[in-house]
Every structure is written in C-alpha cells, then in structure tokens.
C-alpha cells in the first residue's frame, strides 16, 4: 500500500509536524509519498531524500512539484498534462490548527479520500480544551474545577492556577501563575495565541501519562502507558526535546 504523509500546515506547531514526518520516514517501512503544506497552505510533493529540517527552513521545498487536490487524490500539473501521485491512504501528521482541528479531516472526507486519523467531529471536540472538559463531565470523568476567560477578563479561581490557550497544543502559551505579579504577563502570552483561555487550579507534582490508541474494526488497540519526566509542568522543550532524546519507559501505576 502507498501512503501519503501530509505534514506542515499553517500552525504554531509547524516545525514539530516536520519532525514527525521525518520520524515516520525512519519508522514506517512502506511506500511513502511526502506531501508538505506550507504556511500559505500550498501543497508540495517532497522527495524522500529531501526529508530533513533545513530543507524546509531554507525554503528549498518551493522548487519541488506543486500538488493540486481533486476527487481521487493529489495530482501534479505538467507539460504532459495532469498526473496522479498514486496514494492509497493518507496519514495526517499536521500538528495544531489545520491538522488537529478538523480542517484536514474535513478535506479528506469532502474529496472521498481514505485516511488515518481522527474524523471531523472528534477533531473539533478534542482540539478545544473547553469542549473536551464538557465532554469529560458529561461522561462522568473526574476533572479539575475550571473557568473560561476571554480578553479583558481575569481569573476568579484562587492562586496558584494554570492558564492554557483553549485551541492549541504542545504546551505553547501555557503558564503557571503563582502570584498576582505574574498574571498580566501570563495573560499576554496566552492571548497571543488564542482569544479564549482555560483556567485550572495548578497542582504541583501531579503525574502525567501518554497513551496512544486507534480503532481496528470494533476493537481498540492501545500503546503502553508512558510517564514523561518533567519539571514544574510538562512544557514544550520537555515534550519534544528532552523526552524525544531519551528512551520512554512504561509508567509504574498501581492497580488501585
């Protein structure tokens, strides 16, 4: 089977998506086509030999063939006409907006393309921390007290608390506020990325776990549960630099 790896996107997490695509090139032993989405949402067909970070940061990708989407998949335009690139199934590796918020899922569904990744409804729900909170409460999942603030509003929860842009991942824009002096700067940082901020009590020393899963027919396949090392909070650097450079260990969780 020929897989199309779609990565990049107009997102704050653009570079992480590139790193993910490079990683899947090493890990997935299959026929792969690499489809890069730049900040202007233009599509490019990338040669596997060019899959390295500086190829994209140097803008060399602009010399690659541009791709165009139609029913049936991506095609190239040339002097000999239109040519399909021949992909059986697409894998969505775009991080953040475009990839995780449902845009790419909706595009795949609209053009009747087979793809691996969350569907439109699941993407929309999970990309919003506020909607995820509401869903968790509806399903009876224990969750922290919270409030949602917009610009020109300030939290009412007692200190310390943690501020999280509602529609963003990778801990970007997240701040822990321990006293009133730290609040204005933390709000400026959060609202730089989103117009809506989720506020929760900050609990020092809380354990965090990673668990991946996917559905095969009626069954769910789950990975081992990993526990990343962190400092006060699991920030961007620890998620993608420190954690990526060390081997991950299965979390030690009691049955209780």
Model-derived regions: residue spans:
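ATP-binding N-terminal substructure of ATP-dependent carboxylate-amine bond-forming enzymes
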Residues: 1-116
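Phosphate-binding site of ATP-dependent enzymes
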Residues: 179-256
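Short, acidic/turn-prone active-site loops that include or flank metal/cofactor-
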Residues: 119-124, 227-230
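Short catalytic-loop micro-motif centered on adjacent basic/acidic residues
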Residues: 90-93, 116-118, 145, 198-200
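Glycine-rich phosphate/pyrophosphate-binding beta-alpha loops
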Residues: 95-96, 171, 229-234
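Active-site nucleotide/adenylate-binding loops and adjacent lid/helix of ATP-dependent enzymes
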Residues: 2-22, 32-33, 80, 123-207, ...
């Amino acid at each position: 089977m020929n897989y199309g790896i779609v990565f990049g996107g107009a997102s704050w997490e653009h570079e992480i998506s590139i790193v993910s695509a490079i990683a899947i090139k090493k890990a997935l032993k299959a026929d792969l086509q690499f489809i890069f989405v730049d900040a202007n949402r233009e599509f490019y067909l990338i040669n596997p030999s060019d899959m390295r970070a500086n190829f994209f940061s140097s803008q060399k990708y602009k010399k690659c063939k541009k791709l165009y989407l139609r029913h049936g998949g991506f095609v190239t335009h040339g002097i000999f006409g239109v040519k399909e690139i021949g992909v059986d199934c697409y894998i969505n590796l775009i991080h953040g907006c475009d990839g995780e918020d449902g845009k790419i899922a909706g595009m795949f569904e609209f053009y009747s393309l087979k793809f691996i990744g969350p569907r439109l409804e699941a993407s929309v729900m999970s990309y919003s921390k506020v909607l995820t909170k509401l869903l968790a409460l509806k399903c009876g999942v224990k969750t922290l007290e919270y409030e949602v603030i917009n610009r020109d509003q300030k939290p009412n929860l007692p200190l310390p608390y943690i501020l999280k842009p509602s529609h963003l991942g990778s801990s970007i824009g997240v701040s822990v506020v321990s006293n009133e002096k730290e609040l204005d700067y933390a709000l400026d940082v959060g609202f730089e990325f989103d117009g809506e901020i989720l506020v929760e009590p900050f609990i020092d020393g809380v354990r965090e776990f990673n668990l991946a899963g996917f559905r095969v027919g009626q069954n769910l396949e789950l990975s081992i549960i990993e526990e990343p090392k962190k400092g006060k909070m699991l920030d961007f650097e620890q998620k993608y630099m420190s954690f990526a450079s060390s081997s991950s260990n299965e979390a030690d969780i009691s049955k209780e």
